[in-house]
């Protein structure tokens, strides 16, 4: 019992620190190693070097280029006036009252096209900030709006989504990304409808109080007022290019390099072997972002050139902060998952009798503890997938349903205050947990209820 309390105390400390605005880069190792100290004092050093730093550095190695290119792309979209051009067109066509659905739609299209959640946050923020400012919608609702579009139904519920949360279950259940399509569509509609209703209700309440976009805000878009705005079709072209090329490169890269690639250079003592399958998605989004950056520079250089040096420095600083925040969370999750309290908790969750509820609760709780949807789901399925499969066969539950429930459950409690994506999104928007986390939490609750709704729908109708 004490081991469980230690693990949960570390989690509570990190969540409290994140909510109060303390640096997660500092408090993630403090919380993780504090738990190790209380469990086995002699293991603190090895746990820090061999677990925390190993996972943290591994995350940076894989994903920092994505953070960097995403931040630069978003900054150029902002400086070029592309974001303001698209916002002006959206207001002309749809009116200011549809600002929230427009941002949700843009985020959804990008994530369903395979663009990383982190990249979407960087790329969409300039549009969202400009549109919300002109529409008089509080800036504090931007993170929840982006979360609804990028961190919810297109992440793991919508059939066919290429996001990793929808791919992980395939290796455990022998399914594919289109598993349980009707349940996925039903869950997606549940999230979209109730998410938009909640956001619009918050907007109306803010209007009634006379609350506008806000003042004295940080990380505001810096598009100068004296530039000529490009045509909206030119402005939206880089976003479409990134989404399209990301999809194409995902298919092309394995064809170019094969299953693995050996790098041989005169100065190397031995060849560097890369397993292409594991890195394809990352290379694809990097190539797509580079192409998008080049297109923005070509089409908008006249507006960008005077602010390129300053803007690029700001983008690099933002990318470093966002990547290190998320990497620290990754290290924290690795340490906590190795503690005896975590194993006790995992075994306790396995005792839940209903197979779908067992899977949903196990995945979402472990995702919440580790602060990672993919991490929590991987741990849960690695430990319990055989049990889930046996129980599903005994209850005549198709494995496709297990896939969809696991994927959707991973995106529930993973958005607690210490989650890396949440911290990154707040850092990009220049908002604190106190200002904006309430909205993200509301989307989290809706997302969690959607999983229960999908389970109930299956049991009542048998639809898959």
Tell me the role of every PLM-derived stretch.
Residues 7, 39, 182-311, 428-429, ...:
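Long, contiguous bundles of hydrophobic transmembrane helices that form the permeation core
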Residues 97-110, 137-154, 180-185, 189, ...:
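Alpha-helical transmembrane segments of multi-pass membrane proteins
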Residues 71, 85-87, 119-131, 160-172, ...:
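Re-entrant/interfacial helical elements at transmembrane boundaries that shape
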Residues 64-70, 93-130, 323-331, 352-390:
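Hydrophobic alpha-helical transmembrane segments of multi-pass integral membrane proteins
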Residues 6-18, 29-38, 67-72, 106-111, ...:
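Hydrophobic core segments of alpha-helical transmembrane domains in multi-pass membrane transport
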Residues 90, 94, 425-446:
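Interfacial loop-to-transmembrane junctions
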Residues 26-29, 48-84, 109, 276-341:
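Core transmembrane alpha-helical segments of multi-pass membrane transporters/permeases
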Residues 20-24, 60-63, 74-84, 110-123, ...:
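Short helix-coil transition sites and intra-membrane helix breaks within transmembrane domains
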């Amino acid at each position: 019992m004490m081991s469980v309390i230690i693990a949960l105390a570390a989690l509570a400390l990190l969540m409290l620190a994140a909510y109060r605005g303390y640096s997660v880069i500092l408090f993630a190792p403090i919380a993780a190693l504090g738990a190790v100290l209380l469990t086995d004092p002699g293991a603190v050093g090895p746990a820090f070097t061999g677990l925390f730093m190993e996972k943290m550095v591994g995350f940076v190695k894989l994903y920092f280029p994505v953070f960097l290119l995403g931040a630069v792309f978003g900054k150029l979209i902002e400086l070029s006036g592309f974001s303001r051009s698209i916002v002006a067109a959206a207001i002309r066509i749809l009116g200011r009252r549809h600002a929230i659905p427009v941002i949700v739609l843009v985020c959804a299209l990008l994530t369903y096209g395979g663009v990383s959640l982190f990249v979407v946050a960087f790329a969409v923020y300039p549009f969202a900030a400009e549109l919300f400012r002109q529409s008089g919608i509080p800036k504090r609702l931007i993170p929840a709006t982006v979360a609804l579009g990028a961190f919810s139904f297109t992440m793991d519920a919508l059939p066919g989504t290429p996001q990793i949360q929808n791919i992980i279950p395939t290796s455990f259940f022998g399914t594919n990304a289109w598993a349980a399509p009707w349940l996925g569509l039903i869950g997606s509609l549940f999230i979209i409808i109730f998410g938009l209703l909640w956001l619009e209700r918050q907007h109306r309440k803010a209007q009634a109080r006379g609350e506008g976009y806000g003042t004295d805000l940080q990380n505001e878009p810096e598009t100068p007022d004296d530039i000529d705005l490009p045509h909206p079709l030119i402005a939206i072209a880089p976003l479409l290019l990134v989404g399209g090329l990301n999809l194409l490169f995902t298919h092309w890269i394995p064809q170019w390099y094969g299953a693995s690639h050996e790098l041989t250079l005169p100065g190397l003592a031995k060849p560097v072997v890369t397993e292409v399958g594991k890195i394809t998605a990352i290379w694809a989004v990097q190539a797509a972002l580079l192409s998008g950056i080049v297109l923005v520079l070509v089409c908008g250089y006249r507006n960008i050139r005077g602010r390129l040096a300053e803007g690029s420095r700001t983008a690099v600083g933002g990318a470093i902060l966002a990547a290190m925040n998320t990497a620290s969370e990754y290290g924290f999750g690795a340490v906590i998952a190795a503690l005896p309290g975590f194993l006790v908790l995992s075994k306790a969750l396995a005792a839940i009798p209903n197979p779908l509820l067992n899977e949903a609760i196990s995945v979402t709780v472990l995702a919440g503890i580790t602060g990672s949807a993919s991490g929590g789901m991987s741990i849960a399925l690695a430990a319990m997938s055989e049990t889930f499969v046996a129980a599903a066969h005994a209850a005549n539950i198709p494995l496709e349903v297990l896939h969809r429930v696991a994927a959707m459950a991973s995106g529930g409690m993973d958005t607690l205050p210490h989650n890396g994506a949440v911290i990154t999104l707040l850092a990009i928007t220049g908002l604190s947990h106190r200002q904006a986390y309430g909205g993200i939490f509301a989307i989290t609750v809706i997302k969690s209820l959607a999983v229960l709704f999908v389970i109930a729908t299956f049991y009542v109708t048998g639809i898959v």
